[in-house]
Structures are given as structure tokens and as C-alpha cells.
């Protein structure tokens, strides 16, 4: 009777999923063997996804072939309940383990290339963007560029635009002082009479600059009268449009990049020579536009140089030596007249 009970226990273990005793333990059973068989069965089920359990139960552990991992071996499935012969139908669908480190998902294949590169966050789009400072933008286009565009355009003669100056120019002290001095000098040369109206701004500095310009400019006109006449005939100035076209000549004077007070005073002196011509042909109304053209090109294109030279104060200081020589000449002439030296000394100091 004891043998019958033992056989019943063995059959019960086989039915409930226990280890095969005939092959694995040589016909003997113990609590340690059952635990070992149960652990081996659970390991086999986990590695095989629950589908290899029947093969292990039906045969011996040594006779079963080695388990081959399927391509989806990384899929995790719940182990089957004890006594179940197949996988648990109540288990959730297996999920694929994501072993990649957490990072931003890469774009799909069809978006690789320029489309994928275009995907940017708002922070990336604004990174490195710096608005252009307003103070660095020029208030007006340099006059030299305007002259170049006008001269290269179809049907244009290189004349300056007749638009009024902006507010920045009206408040420009260097431009205002230059226009006042040049305009006064050209009018006085054309009419041959002194203007009694006082100069604005810094009256002492402007008056000194005007006196220096009159002295030096008159000498330039006397020394280069023949050259000025040839230039005037070539330009054939008759009206205001011709006066504005002088800007091309003025720009050409400084085209080689050399700037000095000698060139500047020669330019203004030629303007005074043209002003006399305009007076002779009853075109006095063109004298003011002529002064504006000279001032525009001079101040707009040579502003940095003029500022470094201290403007009209530097102009007066530069020709101060010439003024000293003029004073010495006057003293010598007076002495020669008193002493009766004669015309020989006057010729030498001329």
C-alpha cells in the first residue's frame, strides 16, 4: 500500500509540472530534488519565453538539446502559473527593452538631410542673434557713393541730388561752419565787396579762418589763373545744372587718396574763380549751390581727416608761417622805401 501512494505522488508531480524522476533522479524523490527541479524549470521558462517548459518536463535535463535563443529573446514575458502547460494568456504583450541612453530622438529616414537639420528649438534659432545697433548705421549715404551711382546711371551727368539735408546735417557744427566760410568767400570774390554781416557760431574762429582763406586763396588764383581759365573753358559752366556737375571734378581731386590743406585751399580757390564767372554771366543765384557742392564733397568725404586736423583752427595754424612771412615782407618793403634802397631790394623780397 505504501508503494501505491508513492506512485500516486509521482504522477501528481508530473501532472503539476514537477521534474521527471525517472530520468533526473534515478527513481528517488526528496524535497531538495523537487526544489532543484522547480528552480531549473523556472529558469528554462524565463530563457525560452515559456514555450520550452514542456520539453524539459517530458525528458531529462541531460538529454535535452541546448536552448537556442530566438531573435526576440529580449522580449520579456511573465512566467506561466504553476501547473499551466502553455504560456499565460493573461500576460501583457511583450515589450522591447530600450537599452539606448536617453537622448533626443533622431529624425526618420525620410527627414534625414536638410529637413532634419532644419528642426531647431526656439533657443537654437535665437542663439547668436545680435540686433544691429542703431548708432552704427549711417545716417546718410556717403556723397562719394551718390556721385558714383549718379555718374554710372543711364542719362545721368553725375550731378548731386537736390534733396534737402537731414536734421543731423543741420546740427553738424563742422558742416555749418564750413558752408558759412566757403559761401562768404565765394560771394565776396564774385562781388568784389566785403560782407558786413557778422559770421555765426564761433565768430572769432570763423573770422580768422575767413581772413586766412582770403589771403591764401587770392594768392592761389593769381598764381594759377591760366590753369583755372583752361579748366573753366573745358567745363563750360552756364547754369545751375553745370554747377552741380562740378562735384565730379571735386571728387577727382581727391581720387588718389592724398589729402592736405594745399589741395583743399586750391579747390576752394577754383570755386571762387567760378563764382566770378557766374557773376559775369548774370548767374549769381548759382553761387550758393556752388558753395554747397564744395562743402558737401569736402566735409562728407574728408570728415575724419578734418577732425584730426582740428578743422578750421588747424587750417589757420597751418598757414600761420605764411602769415609771418607776409608780415616780414611788409616790414622790409617799408624799410626799403624809407631808406631809399630802391627797386632792387623790392624785387628780391617779392
UniProtKB/Swiss-Prot annotation:
Name used for this protein in its record: Induced myeloid leukemia cell differentiation protein Mcl-1 homolog
PEST-like as annotated region, ranges: 104-175
InterPro entries: Apop_reg_Mc1, Bcl-2-like_sf, Bcl-2_BH1-3, Bcl-2_fam, Bcl2-like, Bcl2_BH1_motif_CS, Bcl2_BH2_motif_CS, Bcl2_BH3_motif_CS
Annotated transmembrane regions: 327-349
Originating organism: Canis lupus familiaris (Dog)
Record-marked site positions (Cleavage): 127-128, 157-158
Biased composition (Low complexity): 31-41
Membrane topology per record: Single-pass membrane protein
Family: Belongs to the Bcl-2 family.
Biased composition (Gly residues): 50-61
Amino acid at each position: 500500500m505504501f508503494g501505491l501512494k508513492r506512485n500516486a505522488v509521482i504522477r501528481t508531480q508530473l501532472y503539476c509540472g514537477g521534474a521527471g524522476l525517472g530520468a533526473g533522479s534515478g527513481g528517488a524523490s526528496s524535497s531538495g530534488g523537487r526544489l532543484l527541479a522547480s528552480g531549473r524549470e523556472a529558469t528554462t521558462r524565463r530563457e525560452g519565453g515559456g514555450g520550452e517548459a514542456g520539453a524539459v518536463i517530458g525528458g531529462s535535463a541531460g538529454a535535452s538539446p541546448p536552448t537556442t535563443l530566438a531573435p526576440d529573446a529580449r522580449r520579456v514575458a511573465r512566467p506561466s502559473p504553476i501547473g499551466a502547460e502553455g504560456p499565460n494568456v493573461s500576460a501583457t504583450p511583450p515589450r522591447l527593452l530600450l537599452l539606448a541612453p536617453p537622448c533626443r530622438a533622431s529624425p526618420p529616414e525620410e527627414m534625414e538631410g536638410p529637413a532634419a537639420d532644419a528642426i531647431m528649438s526656439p533657443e537654437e534659432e535665437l542663439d547668436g542673434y545680435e540686433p544691429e545697433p542703431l548708432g552704427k548705421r549711417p545716417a546718410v549715404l556717403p556723397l562719394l557713393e551718390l556721385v558714383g551711382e549718379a555718374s554710372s546711371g543711364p542719362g545721368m551727368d553725375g550731378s548731386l541730388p537736390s534733396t534737402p539735408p537731414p536734421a543731423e546735417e543741420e546740427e553738424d557744427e563742422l558742416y555749418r561752419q564750413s558752408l558759412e566760410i566757403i559761401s562768404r568767400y565765394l560771394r565776396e570774390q564774385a562781388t568784389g565787396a566785403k560782407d558786413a554781416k557778422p559770421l555765426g557760431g564761433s565768430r572769432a574762429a570763423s573770422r580768422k579762418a575767413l581772413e586766412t582763406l582770403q589771403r591764401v586763396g587770392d594768392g592761389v588764383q593769381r598764381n594759377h589763373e591760366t590753369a583755372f581759365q583752361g579748366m573753366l573753358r573745358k567745363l563750360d559752366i552756364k547754369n545751375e545744372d553745370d554747377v552741380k556737375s562740378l562735384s565730379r571734378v571735386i571728387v577727382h581731386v581727391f581720387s588718389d587718396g592724398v589729402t592736405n590743406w594745399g589741395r583743399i585751399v586750391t579747390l576752394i580757390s577754383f570755386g571762387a574763380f567760378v563764382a566770378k564767372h557766374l557773376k559775369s554771366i548774370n548767374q549769381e543765384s548759382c553761387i550758393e549751390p556752388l558753395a554747397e557742392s564744395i562743402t558737401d564733397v569736402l566735409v562728407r568725404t574728408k570728415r575724419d581727416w578734418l577732425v584730426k586736423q582740428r578743422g578750421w583752427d588747424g587750417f589757420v595754424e597751418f598757414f600761420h608761417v605764411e602769415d609771418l612771412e607776409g608780415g616780414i615782407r611788409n616790414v622790409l618793403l617799408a624799410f626799403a622805401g624809407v631808406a631809399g634802397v630802391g627797386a632792387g631790394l623790392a624785387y628780391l623780397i617779392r
